[in-house]
Amino acid sequence: MATEHVNGNGTEEPMDTTSAVIHSENFQTLLDAGLPQKVAEKLDEIYVAGQRKYGGPPPDSVYSGQQPSVGTEIFVGKIPRDLFEDELVPLFEKAGPIWDLRLMMDPLTGLNRGYAFVTFCTKEAAQEAVKLYNNHEIRSGKHIGVCISVANNRLFVGSIPKSKTKEQILEEFSKVTEGLTDVILYHQPDDKKKNRGFCFLEYEDHKTAAQARRRLMSGKVKVWGNVGTVEWADPIEDPDPEVMAKVKVLFVRNLANTVTEEILEKSFSQFGKLERVKKLKDYAFIHFDERDGAVKAMEEMNGKDLEGENIEIVFAKPPDQKRKERKAQRQAAKNQMYDDYYYYGPPHMPPPTRGRGRGGRGGYGYPPDYYGYEDYYDYYGYDYHNYRGGYEDPYYGYEDFQVGARGRGGRGARGAAPSRGRGAAPPRGRAGYSQRGGPGSARGVRGARGGAQQQRGRGVRGARGGRGGNVGGKRKADGYNQPDSKRRQTNNQNWGSQPIAQQPLQGGDHSGNYGYKSENEEFYQDTFGQQWK
């Protein structure tokens, strides 16, 4: 048996490296170059893991507490590629004691990949590092970006049978994945016995969540005889305590259908002057004039019965502009296939977007993530771990999995296409082909597919055209490529309409990585690196 000293620190027991150590294809090259065994193995780790780690538990004289928990790690982006630990560690040690630092490396060039993760011993040190070094000029003309790193341990799972309970879902998914700790499930407002067809699975840590995601997305695992829809959910971000200390708005959920804004105003006004009350489905926002009134109301009313339901109250999470920007980017990417969709943030009312009805182009709806309520309600994330924790979209964006005018109408007549600019374009349909649907009246110059459509100029829009005749499921005769459906493709699942899941933090790869585009990255890459491209 070959015996080797791997770590090079003090007296070591022999170990069988042939089975315990997995080397990359570059390991022999390093040995052939004359490098010592230990040095070659350390360098080979960079090829395998794609990172270089500094530190570990610091000496007891520096820190003798427990292992750091959530909120102690920061992400450092836009690092100059030729900058290493010898400059990063002294810089960040000024914010507090460091537990470890992981610098992502490019093994081919020996340079870093432009980002790193620093874990501090305390949350306070991590928050101080963000304040001190976000947009810090680390070299002349080179500014780094720093933010709290959030290890995502939640998965969105769609296509859940609506009759299943939280306990049944927890039991079923525990059979096929490891480390599942909780299930977050929402019920339909008008029928508390039924769920909304989706849930969130919470795992012990990001590593187990990533493994579960890969397993569930493999197509080999079926739950209740079906392959589910699985995506990353947005991770929970702890709000700034200084910001939360100023919040005067309460988020109230689990309201009965009979509860009105007038009832809420009467119930909460006894604790202080109200600026306004806004109820949406079975939740509401209560705006107080003073924070003291909001604090007192939450203490007195949380868990109390209101019109037959026990309400739950937390402070509403204020706007996070960076999260809104990320949401806008994800939403724009999700809707690239949709015609005439652009993101408009509150408080401006967006113009209506086209529905997906096929005859007469359907009715008009609003963008999928616009909820119709005023001003900044869309910004609130309801950061509460027992429901909707930290997620930006109110869960009513998933209501019955139907948003706006998404229904398919009958296909309209397939006549000549309109001219789209300065001059007539040739017709798209085949000459002499029969119409596909019944004729529809013109909507100005835009009507059913058989009629002429409006030019893409400054024409006058007239009345809406009717829907075309129903020829459900037939293919277009002229070879026109029909755009993909807005509905998520779920392998012919048959549990009713499918949900449109929260977008993952980046594309839909199956590796568990997100934020970075390298095949070498593993589960440790758990933050929003895409902010600093």
Curated annotation (Swiss-Prot):
Signal peptide: none annotated. GO terms for biological process: cellular response to type II interferon; circadian rhythm; CRD-mediated mRNA stabilization; mRNA processing; negative regulation of mRNA modification; negative regulation of nuclear-transcribed mRNA catabolic process, deadenylation-dependent decay; negative regulation of translation; positive regulation of cytoplasmic translation. The modification Phosphotyrosine is found at residue 283. The modification N-acetylalanine is found at residue 2. The modification Omega-N-methylarginine is found at residues 354, 406, 428, 436, 446, 449. A motif (Bipartite nuclear localization signal) lies at residues 474-488. Keywords: Acetylation, Cytoplasm, Endoplasmic reticulum, Isopeptide bond, Methylation, Microsome, mRNA processing, mRNA splicing, Nucleus, Phosphoprotein, Repeat, Ribonucleoprotein, RNA-binding, Spliceosome, Ubl conjugation. Residues 370-398 are annotated as: 3 X 4 AA repeats of Y-Y-G-Y. Residues 310-471 are annotated as: Interaction with APOBEC1. InterPro entries: HnRNP_R/Q_splicing_fac, hnRNPQ_RRM1, hnRNPQ_RRM2, Nucleotide-bd_a/b_plait_sf, RBD_domain_sf, RRM_dom. The domain containing eight Arg-Gly-Gly repeats (RGG/RXR-box) may be involved in RNA-binding and protein-protein interactions. It is methylated by PRMT1, and essential for nuclear localization. Identified in a histone pre-mRNA complex, at least composed of ERI1, LSM11, SLBP, SNRPB, SYNCRIP and YBX1. Identified in the spliceosome C complex. Component of the coding region determinant (CRD)-mediated complex, composed of DHX9, HNRNPU, IGF2BP1, SYNCRIP and YBX1. Identified in a mRNP complex, at least composed of DHX9, DDX3X, ELAVL1, HNRNPU, IGF2BP1, ILF3, PABPC1, PCBP2, PTBP2, STAU1, STAU2, SYNCRIP and YBX1. Heterogenous nuclear ribonucleoprotein (hnRNP) implicated in mRNA processing mechanisms. Component of the CRD-mediated complex that promotes MYC mRNA stability. Is associated in vitro with pre-mRNA, splicing intermediates and mature mRNA protein complexes. Binds to apoB mRNA AU-rich sequences. Part of the APOB mRNA editosome complex and may modulate the postranscriptional C to U RNA-editing of the APOB mRNA through either by binding to A1CF (APOBEC1 complementation factor), to APOBEC1 or to RNA itself. May be involved in translationally coupled mRNA turnover. This is Heterogeneous nuclear ribonucleoprotein Q. It comes from Rattus norvegicus (Rat).
